[in-house]
C-alpha cells in the first residue's frame, strides 16, 4: 500500500528530468541569478588575468624556448646534412677516380705483362727454332754421312755380289776395274 500511495503522490507532482519538483522550488541556479552577475564577472576577470599571467610568464616562454631550440636544432641538422652530402659527393668522386686509375693501371700492367710474355715466348721460340735448325743440319749431315757410308758399303757389296755372279756363270773371277766401271755406269 505504501508503494501505491507513493506512486499516486508522484503522479500528482510534476518532476523535471533532474528529479527536482517544480513546485516549491528553491533559489535559482547561481550562475543564472542576476544578483550574482557582478561577482561572477569579477571572478571571471581575476581568473582570466591569473591564467593570462601564468601563461605569459611561465608556459609561453617555455614553449617559445622549445620552439626556438627546435628550430636551431633543425637548422644545425640541415647544415650538417648539407655538409655531409657534399663530403659524400666528394668521396664518391674520389672513389670513382681511384677506380678509374686502378683500372687504367691494371690495363697497362696487363698489356705490359702480355708484351713481356710475348717477347719471352718469341725469344724461346727463336731459340727452339735455332736449336731445331742446328739439330736438323746435324741430322742431315749424319744422314749424308750414313748414306755415303751405306752407299760405299752397297758399292762394295754390289761388287762382291756381281763378282760372285760373274764367277758363277763364267767360272773365272772378273777384272775388278772393269766391274767397278760397269757398276758406276749403271748407278
Swiss-Prot record:
Transmembrane segments: 40-60
A GO cellular component annotation in the UniProt record: proton-transporting ATP synthase complex
Pfam families to which the protein is assigned, alphabetical: ATP-synt_B (PF00430)
Composition bias type Basic and acidic residues, residue spans: 1-12
GO MF entries: proton-transporting ATP synthase activity, rotational mechanism; proton-transporting ATPase activity, rotational mechanism
Subcellular location, record wording: Cell inner membrane
Region (Disordered): 1-31
InterPro entries linked to this entry: ATP_synth_b/b'su_bac/chlpt, ATP_synthase_B_chain
UniProt keyword list: ATP synthesis, Cell inner membrane, Cell membrane, CF(0), Hydrogen ion transport, Ion transport, Membrane, Transmembrane, Transmembrane helix, Transport
Main localization, broad class: membrane
Lipid bilayer topology: Single-pass membrane protein
Family under the similarity heading: Belongs to the ATPase B chain family.
HAMAP family (UniProt xref): ATP_synth_b_bprime
Function (record text): F(1)F(0) ATP synthase produces ATP from ADP in the presence of a proton or sodium gradient. F-type ATPases consist of two structural domains, F(1) containing the extramembraneous catalytic core and F(0) containing the membrane proton channel, linked together by a central stalk and a peripheral stalk. During catalysis, ATP synthesis in the catalytic domain of F(1) is coupled via a rotary mechanism of the central stalk subunits to proton translocation. Component of the F(0) channel, it forms part of the peripheral stalk, linking F(1) to F(0). The b'-subunit is a diverged and duplicated form of b found in plants and photosynthetic bacteria.
Subunit structure: F-type ATPases have 2 components, F(1) - the catalytic core - and F(0) - the membrane proton channel. F(1) has five subunits: alpha(3), beta(3), gamma(1), delta(1), epsilon(1). F(0) has three main subunits: a(1), b(2) and c(10-14). The alpha and beta chains form an alternating ring which encloses part of the gamma chain. F(1) is attached to F(0) by a central stalk formed by the gamma and epsilon chains, while a peripheral stalk is formed by the delta and b chains.
Protein name: ATP synthase subunit b 2
Source species: Beijerinckia indica subsp. indica (strain ATCC 9039 / DSM 1715 / NCIMB 8712)
Amino acid at each position: 500500500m505504501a508503494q501505491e500511495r507513493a506512486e499516486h503522490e508522484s503522479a500528482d507532482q510534476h518532476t523535471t528530468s533532474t528529479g527536482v519538483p517544480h513546485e516549491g522550488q528553491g533559489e535559482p541556479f547561481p550562475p543564472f541569478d542576476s544578483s550574482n552577475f557582478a561577482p561572477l564577472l569579477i571572478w571571471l576577470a581575476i581568473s582570466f588575468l591569473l591564467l593570462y599571467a601564468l601563461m605569459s610568464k611561465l608556459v609561453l616562454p617555455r614553449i617559445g624556448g622549445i620552439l626556438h631550440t627546435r628550430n636551431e636544432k633543425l637548422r644545425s641538422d640541415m647544415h650538417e646534412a648539407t655538409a655531409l652530402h657534399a663530403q659524400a659527393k666528394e668521396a664518391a668522386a674520389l672513389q670513382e677516380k681511384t677506380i678509374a686509375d686502378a683500372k687504367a693501371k691494371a690495363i697497362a700492367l696487363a698489356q705490359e705483362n702480355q708484351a713481356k710474355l710475348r717477347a719471352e715466348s718469341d725469344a724461346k721460340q727463336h731459340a727452339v727454332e735455332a736449336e731445331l735448325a742446328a739439330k736438323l743440319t746435324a741430322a742431315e749431315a749424319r744422314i749424308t754421312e750414313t748414306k755415303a757410308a751405306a752407299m760405299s758399303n752397297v758399292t762394295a757389296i754390289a761388287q762382291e755380289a756381281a763378282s760372285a755372279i760373274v764367277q758363277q756363270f763364267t767360272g773365272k773371277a772378273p777384272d775388278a776395274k772393269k766391274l767397278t766401271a760397269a757398276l758406276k755406269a749403271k748407278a
